[in-house]
Amino acid sequence: CIRDSSKEELEAAARRQLREILERIYREPPQYDDVIDTLFSKLPAIRDTLDTDVQAAYEGDPAATCREEVMLAYPAFEAISIFRIAHELYLMKVPMLPRMMTEYAHSLTGIDIHPGATVGPYFFIDHGTGVVIGETTVIGEHVKLYQGVTLGAKSFAVKADGTLVK
């Protein structure tokens, strides 16, 4: 029989899993506990922002029958959810993991959002295949994108041979 898990048990399990992921990725580990504590402190704000994203999708897509459908069946919401967590890790300067997370979302959904991009609340991507949002992109509030849109990577300086200056 499966019993209900308490909030504390779920958080402890999530913390253990995140620690295991960090330990597998990094030879020179960051301060695991600091990273985990900081990320968990940001989860309520991430959830609030994701709630605005669900609302934007529900209100912006006539085919959406309910908010639960958006959360469970919309690939774009999955990509945005992963991005929002990866973005916080990126801001915390956690190396590699944020990019791995958004590349995973890209492989699942066809939506490529760099973890360094800035994306405001009430964000919705409808039919998101081929959407690319680069690291330098800044997206405000109440924005809706459709398939095949590329944003960012236009502001880099280039050398005489056409290669990017990093």
Positions of predicted regions on the chain:
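Flexible, glycine/small-residue-enriched loop-and-beta-strand segment within the central core
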Residues: 87-166
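Terminal amphipathic alpha-helical/low-complexity segments used for targeting or macromolecular assembly
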Residues: 3-103
